[in-house]
Amino acid sequence: MSLFDGKKVIIIGDRDGIPGPAIAECLKGTAAEVVYSATECFVUTAAGAMDLENQNRVKGFADQFGAENLVVLVGAAEAESAGLAAETVTAGDPTFAGPLAGVQLGLRVFHAVEPEFKDAVDSAVYDEQIGMMEMVLDVDSIIAEMKSIREQFGKFND
């Protein structure tokens, strides 16, 4: 059983990391249904926080489909930015500025370089779409940060 079986996927890519279309392309061979994909500039938003529009969309999809049916994928270039995005969709907006302030959705959230994502998609497509960025990103730091956030705030640890 894949992480994506029967799941609705929200993609928040990064202009300086892994863009949304690259992540979406990797998902084409899975049972995932991409309901939203965006590519942001994480360093452009306030202190690397998740864009307010994206927070609103995540909240709306959680209301529409149920938090248990969602997976959020991020492509942030840095562990800190990835962690902020992950914290926002699990524990709520840490800046207390957006629609997810105080909203603990506990969503499943992964970075595109994590093994949970990488192992669930076609390796040739992954190498073509993400392989080059994987070589320049600090993958170990990103994995550690994402795992820490999931362990602290994730409600769906399957």
Curated annotation (Swiss-Prot):
Name the UniProt record assigns to this protein: Glycine/sarcosine/betaine reductase complex component A1
> What does the record note on quaternary structure?
Monomer. Component of the glycine, sarcosine and betaine reductase complexes, together with components B and C.
Per the record, GO CC terms? Answer: glycine reductase complex
Give the UniProt keywords, A-Z.
Oxidoreductase, Selenocysteine
Q: Which HAMAP family match?
A: GRDA
Transmembrane stretches, by residue range?
none
Q: List the catalytic activities from the record.
A: acetyl phosphate + [thioredoxin]-disulfide + NH4(+) + H2O = [thioredoxin]-dithiol + glycine + phosphate + H(+); acetyl phosphate + methylamine + [thioredoxin]-disulfide + H2O = sarcosine + [thioredoxin]-dithiol + phosphate + H(+); acetyl phosphate + trimethylamine + [thioredoxin]-disulfide + H2O = glycine betaine + [thioredoxin]-dithiol + phosphate + H(+)
Q: Which organism is it from?
A: Peptoclostridium acidaminophilum
- Does the UniProt entry include the keyword Magnesium? no
Question: What GO molecular function annotations does the UniProt record carry, in alphabetical order?
Answer: betaine reductase activity; glycine reductase activity; sarcosine reductase activity
The organism sits in which domain of life? Bacteria
Q: Which family does it belong to?
A: Belongs to the GrdA family.
Name the EC number(s): 1.21.4.2, 1.21.4.3, 1.21.4.4
Q: Name one Pfam family in it.
A: GRDA
Asked whether the UniProt record includes Oxidoreductase among its keywords, one would answer yes
The record's listing under InterPro entries reads: GRDA (IPR006812)
Question: What does the function comment of this entry state?
Answer: In the first step of glycine, betaine and sarcosine reductases, the substrate is bound to component PB via a Schiff base intermediate. Then the PB-activated substrate is nucleophilically attacked by the selenol anion of component PA to transform it to a carboxymethylated selenoether and the respective amine. By action of component PC, acetyl phosphate is formed, leaving component PA in its oxidized state. Finally component PA becomes reduced by the thioredoxin system to start a new catalytic cycle of reductive deamination.
Annotated catalytic residues: 44
